[in-house]
Amino acid sequence: MRTILNKLNINGEIMLIKDIMKKPIVVYEDNDLIDVIRLFRKNKISGAPVLNKDGKLVGIISESDIVKTIVTHNEDLNLILPSPLDLIELPLKTALKIEEFMEDLKNALKTKVRDVMTRKVIVAKPDMTINDAAKLMVKNNIKRLPVVDDEGNLIGIVTRGDLIEALI
């Protein structure tokens, strides 16, 4: 009995990654995070493979990586309820904290992708079955698999959503 993801393609063969992979939207390791955020929003994606200047796959970046960076940069932002005696100083202290927060946020958004990306990239080959790809994603708790050829060149990407679409 085959698993549910061993769906057959139109030729009656088990579906492979190459049957469902999409053209990847990529970022480069020297991009600023603000540029990556804009790219993610524009393309409605939550992660992307990272290439170096030679076009080689060197990492992967996700919204989680970006959020961790922003949170790390802003750990000192502590706004607590003031005592009645502090009310006189509160507007000034709050303004300074907000100013510090905005400065930290600007600095965080200038961070380079190479400084926050995940370097250990789990990849798929085009001839991998979609069932094996699903197992790999579940085992490693990842949402996307870059697809590489035998030379390690990025040729596509498969997401959990792509696997689900393949079932329909």
UniProtKB/Swiss-Prot annotation:
Gene3D superfamilies: CBS-domain. The keyword Repeat applies. Residues 20-77, 117-168 form the CBS domain. Keywords: CBS domain, Repeat. SMART domains: CBS (SM00116). The keyword Repeat applies. Pfam families: CBS. PANTHER family: CBS DOMAIN-CONTAINING PROTEIN, CBS DOMAIN-CONTAINING PROTEIN CBSX3, MITOCHONDRIAL. This is Uncharacterized protein MJ1426.
